[in-house]
Amino acid sequence: MGDIEFKSSPEFSLGMEIELQLLNPDTLQLVDGISPLLAQTPENSWIQPEFNQAMVEIASQVCSNIPELEANIVAILRDLKTRCQALGMTICTAGTYPCCDRFASITPIPRYLSQQNTSGYLADLMMTCALQLHVGMPSGDVAIDIMGRLKPYLPILLALSASSPFWWGHDTSFASFRQRFLSSMRTYGICPTFKNWQDFTNFFATAQNAGMFEIIRDIHWDLRPQPDFGTLEVRVMDAQPTIKESMMLAAFIHSLIVDMYHHSQGKQTEFLLTPLPWLIERENYFRASRWGLDANYIEDEQGNSRPIRNIVKDILNVLAETADTLGNSSYLFQLEKRLDQGASYIRQRRVFESTGSVKAVVASLVSELEAELAIKSRQEAVAYGWL
């Protein structure tokens, strides 16, 4: 394979993908329902199959700002819920399905079947869901530059998004067990660092020749360029049970990337987190997945650490002006409140501690999304805490 063309897109445009679980509304068990769902959905629609037949992925339109993205995702999820209800299913999402008791049924698509063949037993256990955000880039070189700058922030995003404390009915003690599971897969996890777009294309040519990847989509790193879309795709995050949490994270990433771009153009001077050696990167990943917002992040090569909660507050202060310019301030305000109110992994554990039931945890995830999708007025949104 020769040079890969990076198809530029409008700077900092946005696209979101969310993976969700298909459930029986009475038993709250997983349902292998993707085939009938696809059968009643128009081609080239917002709905897409996932690796597991009991899961579905939705994809937004290309949007210019977070409010537009939010409106699009709300409309898509309402439509999805209506379609699922007609088929006797309901939906929810989190980084893992808390009370799984069976192997995954792989969606019979050649790419997924090939992945199953390569991954072996790991494919049978693949019951994870992610939130993915695409941000438009003007060129491949800019995408690779921002990729390197954003890399130290990935453990922060992991801690903020952690929503997978349960695995096969057990409390794993991790905030994000999804990240621990995926770290065992050959094409997932921490992305390498590249000098520029040509450096990336040289790497991909070597990897392709070695039989590691066939296409770019075979790369499942937590951060990857998408040349066909002209985007940088942030993939580190657990799926969020609520739309408002997804939008908080999207606004945080959007503001962060725009600020980084300004920094690269000499328009900003403050840059909080810097690249770290691989072993420290791995340790920060582990800490974020294990302790979530209570983790201490290693900031430098001397081993100095600070609480992630404090680092997030510092980042939000730095991003305040950029967020205001982008119209993201209200979302970041909600994100800061959430530092004290509790991320999803904390809420799930509270439900389990009060009920002793993992099924009750699933019911709470279903209820959280249903409550949002039922909101029809600004007054209801304020009461719910949406605004």
UniProtKB/Swiss-Prot annotation:
InterPro entries to which the protein is assigned, alphabetical: GCL_type2/YbdK_subfam, GCS2, Gln_synth/guanido_kin_cat_dom, YbdK
Keyword ATP-binding: yes
Family the UniProt entry places it in: Belongs to the glutamate--cysteine ligase type 2 family. YbdK subfamily.
Organism: Trichormus variabilis (strain ATCC 29413 / PCC 7937)
SUPFAM superfamilies assigned to the protein according to its UniProt record, in alphabetical order: Glutamine synthetase/guanido kinase (SSF55931)
EC number: 6.3.2.2
GO BP terms: modified amino acid biosynthetic process
Any one GO molecular function term: glutamate-cysteine ligase activity
Function of the molecule: ATP-dependent carboxylate-amine ligase which exhibits weak glutamate--cysteine ligase activity.
Reaction catalyzed: L-cysteine + L-glutamate + ATP = gamma-L-glutamyl-L-cysteine + ADP + phosphate + H(+)
One Pfam family of this chain: GCS2
Keyword list, A-Z: ATP-binding, Ligase, Nucleotide-binding
Name of the protein in its database record: Putative glutamate--cysteine ligase 2
Protein origin, superkingdom: Bacteria
